[in-house]
Amino acid sequence: MSNYPHLLAPLDLGFTTLKNRVLMGSMHVGLEEVQGGYERMAAFYAERAAGGVGLIVTGGISPNDHGVTFFGGSKLDHLEEAEKHKFITKAVHDAGGKIALQILHTGRYSYHPENVAPSAIQAPINPTKPHALTSAEVHQTIADFANCAKLSQIAGYDGVEIMGSEGYLINEFIAARTNHRDDEWGGSYENRIRFPIEIVRRTRQEVGENFIIIYRLSMLDLVEGGSTLEEVIQLAKEIEKAGATIINTGIGWHEARIPTIATKVPRAAFTWVTKKLKGSVKVPLITSNRINTPEMAEHVLAQGDADIISMARPMLADSHFVLKAEQGRADEINTCIGCNQACLDHIFSMKIATCLVNPRACYETELIFKESPVAKNIAVIGAGPAGLSFATYAADRGHKVTIFEASNQIGGQFNIAKTIPGKEEFYETLRYFKRKIELQPNIKLV
């Protein structure tokens, strides 16, 4: 019997079935804009599909020019672009997975001078004041979302996720904080939620019934002038009526000052918010944020907080997270420690994302570790994270590795870092390497 019966249970959506309750959450990784990026994304996502993820969601792709994060950012609004995405969908399907494209219009968070919003109110984290969309432009933006979804379907995606959370354009229409309009798209709450409802309704019309539509709903804005719980529930019901297959629950705007994914945030700290929506809608609910072990994911599902667990960064840290859980090898999972140093920090610095504990992430086409034709005897001086990482990869390739460590424990300066309040997750990396050494006969620690 599985140790994770809820997590590994299939989910019947009527027209299709997800093989388990694990969703790889959306992350922009920077491959979307680089030369050869589609081939690299294909390898990146395919490896996670082979690792057992039930449904993958891509990084955010804009439905038009105004919604890109920066000039030259990734978008999908022409058939020629859809053809490129077929590299990704074919690779994922060949690996036995399913994948949805996230449609993200960044609104006033766009870092270019032609950004737009419901009202001309500058974001505190952006130097550029947005242009307020006219009513005609609002209608065109709705059509652009539907067109992007149709192109995603043509490209072979199994569905789309409509990003309505985290303070991006859709969320900006919903919140009184950012919507000061006095037309049909502003004023009353019913008017402010017309934009997301119309996007979902038009998208469903465009793609038909047998296509997954996930709507990412902001459950907790964590900013002044955000939605109340009663308003969120009202919107969720309308989104369900409009045709959403699944609702994903988002937490916090990017300008919010309350941490939501940092390592000091307790595991599964926000699943209680998702549970508030349970019973109000019939579609499956996704919860997320700081769920990084199969044990925690199982607990969240078992207590009825949600139907699906979204894990984004944990899939950077270990592409075979789900497979290891299925095979009773959860102690071999390379756990995400929530440091954000090589994922978010890289993206904010305009670099390709990777992972502090798994530097191969997003470099699957470059770092290909095959068995070495000649086994060598290799000495590694120091059992810090770098030495441990090299030693385990070298041993996996067939080399005989001896690690020389002066202290009585592995980990180097990680042993200092893990003692800092809020950095307890760093223990997980040392646990992972300790287990790797125990299981790898090619490594000797002296």
List where the protein language model places each region.
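Flavin-dependent oxidoreductase catalytic cores
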Residues: 1-381, 385-401, 406-409, 413-415
